[in-house]
Each structure stands twice: as structure tokens, then as C-alpha cells.
């Protein structure tokens, strides 16, 4: 087999894998629309989507299940892509928004905005609300930015190894968690209920306004990462190789980390902490299709959407009518994966 034929086969396998994920995402979305306390048939779902459904079915589809599905897709894409890019930029397979402390920094910023400025809270009925989603997003981004800046400064000034950067991320996570607990200590009962509930990654709280904001951040971020795909491939080959190919490595790392932080911040501000999606998805995709970022970025996005949607559907149905926060399930999945990767790294050493 000559080189052009090998390249066609190489590309064809990746495209087929992407198509399989698209089909899986579509079927999972239909299934998620049908299952729940209020079970629906496919015909009822289609009629509601076409505008011909009954009022009660329309309410369930458009106000409850569709927002949840779109939140899962957008959040899964955002976290998976952020994780894939961070693993490249930091040259560490353990890097992700969760393990680097970015999620906890965003959580601290969001809680600070909720308590100190009253941008969100809880009603006596238990319903969580957001008064100003834009300001909460800004504060969440600022919290994440603090963690990113500290880690990058330590890496630059002290020449941290990839392993030490993960430890720095763990330290920042602990610091932000302590800050969040301090804020909780001075909160009243309703504010405390809102903050504790916020720490659970839950897609059920998403509303259309927040989904539009998440999509408005995710789409241009994904476009930017695809635009920089060749630079990321060069970085995978090594620092000196990337520089010899004309890549401004410091600028690429800085902007990549900032965009990944913004993606994470928006998701945390509206949905809470959903851990390990950014760690699991890029690794599984890399095993299946390799490390070419031309394909790794979009297929990681699809895989993240599928994983989070299936996990959320499972969380809604496993002990129905009780709905588990999806962040609990992703942590159960991600923690063993994290330990496996950690042991694998130290075996190489």
C-alpha cells in the first residue's frame, strides 16, 4: 500500500469514528427526550418538536428536557476540548480543568458573586436562581484566571515539571475550596443552600438564556482551537521543534489556557463543577484515533457531548424519581481513570 492510500485509510478511520459519535449523539438525544418520570413515545416527541404536541408535553419537552440535553451537549464539548488543549499545552496527560484547579477557581468566583453581590441565591421553596448570569460568568472567569496565572507564573519562574504543575493545580484547588468554605461560613441559610447546591454539577438548572451564553462562548472557542490545530501538533512534537516551525509557544500556551479557562468558567457558573470530563474524553479519543489535533479536537468535543448526555440520562433514571447530579457520576467515572493514568506515568519513570 503506497503512502497516499495509507493516508486515505488513516483519515477514513477517523471520519468514520466521528460519524459513529454523531449518530450516537442523535440517538441518545432522542432517548433522553423520551425517558423520565413523564415517559413519552418518539411520535409524541416529534409532534412536540414540530409544534403539534399537547400543552403538557410541550412544557416537558421545551422547558425541561431540551434545555437539559443542550446543556449536556455544550458542556460536554466545552470541557472535553478544554481538557484536550490543556494536555497539549502543558504536556501532561493528567491536565484538565478539574485537576488543574480551574473549575474550583471558577466555583470560588461564582460563589463570591452570589454571596457578596447577591447575583444569585435560593428561594424558600428550594429553587435556585440567578439574577445576573453575565456578572456571575465574569466573576467565575476571574476566579479561574487567578489559578491559571499562578500556575503559569510558577512554571515560568521556577521551571516546574509537568508533574509539579499538576501538584500546583491540586494546591490551588485546595486554596479555592478553603476560600469557598470561608464564604459559606458567613452566608445565611438560603445563600448557603444555594452555594452547596451549586457545588453539585447539575444540568437540570440550565435555562435557555444560560444555554445561549454557553453556546456563544463555546462556538468561537472551538473555532479558535481548530484554527490553532497545527500549532498544537507542533507542540506535541516538542518545544524546540515547535519553535523551529515558527510557533510562538509562549503566546500559544497563554491564549490557549485563557480560552480553556473561559470555557470552564461559563460551565461552572451555570451548571456547577462537573469533574473529569476534560480528563477522560481526550484520553479515550486519543487511544481510538491517535493524537492528530486536526481530528482530536472535534472528535473529543463529540465524545464529551455523548459521554455527558448518557451520564445525565443515567443519573435521571437510575433511582427515579430521584435525579442525581451528573457531577457525582462523572467523578465516579473519572477518579479511577485519574489513578490509572497516575500509576501509568510513574511506571514510565
Swiss-Prot record:
Highest rank taxon of the organism: Archaea
Name a biological process GO annotation: siderophore-dependent iron import into cell
Which keywords label this protein? Cell membrane, Membrane, Transmembrane, Transmembrane helix, Transport
Entry's SUPFAM superfamilies? ABC transporter involved in vitamin B12 uptake, BtuC
As for subcellular location, the record says: Cell membrane
How is this protein situated with respect to the membrane? Answer: Multi-pass membrane protein
Q: Does the keyword Transmembrane helix apply?
A: yes
* RNA-binding is among the record's keywords: no
> Which residue windows are transmembrane per the record?
15-35, 69-89, 100-120, 135-155, 166-186, 206-226, 254-274, 295-315, 318-338
Which GO-annotated molecular functions does the record name?
transmembrane transporter activity
* GO CC annotations on file: plasma membrane
**Chief localization:** membrane
Query: PANTHER family this protein is in?
Result: ABC TRANSPORTER PERMEASE PROTEIN MJ0876-RELATED, FERRIC ENTEROBACTIN TRANSPORT SYSTEM PERMEASE PROTEIN
Give the protein's biological function. Probably part of a binding-protein-dependent transport system. Probably responsible for the translocation of the substrate across the membrane.
> So what family is this one in?
Belongs to the binding-protein-dependent transport system permease family. FecCD subfamily.
Q: What is this protein called?
A: Putative ABC transporter permease protein MJ0087
Question: Which organism's genome codes for this protein?
Answer: Methanocaldococcus jannaschii (strain ATCC 43067 / DSM 2661 / JAL-1 / JCM 10045 / NBRC 100440) (Methanococcus jannaschii)
Amino acid at each position: 500500500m503506497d503512502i497516499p492510500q495509507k493516508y486515505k485509510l488513516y483519515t477514513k478511520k477517523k471520519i468514520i469514528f466521528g460519524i459513529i459519535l454523531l449518530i450516537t449523539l442523535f440517538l441518545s438525544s432522542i432517548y433522553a427526550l423520551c425517558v423520565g418520570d413523564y415517559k413519552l413515545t418518539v411520535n409524541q416527541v416529534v409532534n412536540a418538536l414540530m409544534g403539534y404536541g399537547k400543552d403538557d408535553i410541550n412544557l416537558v419537552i421545551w422547558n425541561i428536557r431540551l434545555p437539559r440535553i443542550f446543556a449536556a451537549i455544550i458542556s460536554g464539548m466545552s470541557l472535553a476540548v478544554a481538557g484536550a488543549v490543556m494536555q497539549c499545552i502543558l504536556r501532561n496527560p493528567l491536565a484538565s480543568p478539574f485537576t488543574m484547579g480551574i473549575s474550583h477557581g471558577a466555583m470560588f468566583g461564582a460563589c463570591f458573586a452570589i454571596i457578596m453581590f447577591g447575583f444569585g441565591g435560593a428561594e424558600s421553596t428550594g429553587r435556585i436562581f440567578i439574577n445576573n448570569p453575565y456578572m456571575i460568568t465574569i466573576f467565575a472567569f476571574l476566579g479561574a484566571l487567578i489559578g491559571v496565572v499562578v500556575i503559569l507564573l510558577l512554571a515560568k519562574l521556577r521551571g516546574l515539571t509537568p508533574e509539579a504543575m499538576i501538584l500546583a493545580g491540586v494546591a490551588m484547588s485546595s486554596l479555592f475550596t478553603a476560600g469557598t468554605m470561608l464564604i459559606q461560613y458567613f452566608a445565611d441559610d438560603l445563600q448557603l443552600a444555594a452555594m452547596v447546591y451549586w457545588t453539585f454539577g447539575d444540568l437540570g438548572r440550565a435555562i435557555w438564556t444560560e444555554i445561549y451564553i454557553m453556546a456563544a462562548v463555546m462556538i468561537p472557542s472551538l473555532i479558535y482551537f481548530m484554527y490553532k490545530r497545527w500549532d498544537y501538533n507542533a507542540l506535541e512534537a516538542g518545544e524546540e521543534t515547535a519553535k523551529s516551525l515558527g510557533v510562538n509557544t509562549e503566546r500559544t500556551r497563554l491564549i490557549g489556557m485563557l480560552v480553556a479557562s473561559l470555557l470552564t468558567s461559563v460551565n461552572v457558573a451555570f451548571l456547577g463543577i462537573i469533574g473529569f470530563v476534560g480528563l477522560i474524553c481526550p484520553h479515550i479519543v486519543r487511544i481510538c484515533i491517535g493524537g492528530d489535533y486536526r481530528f482530536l479536537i472535534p472528535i473529543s468535543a463529540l465524545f464529551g457531548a455523548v459521554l455527558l448526555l448518557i451520564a445525565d440520562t443515567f443519573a435521571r433514571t437510575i433511582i427515579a424519581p430521584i435525579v442525581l447530579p451528573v457531577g457525582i457520576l462523572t467523578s465516579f467515572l473519572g477518579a479511577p481513570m485519574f489513578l490509572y493514568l497516575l500509576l501509568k506515568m510513574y511506571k514510565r519513570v
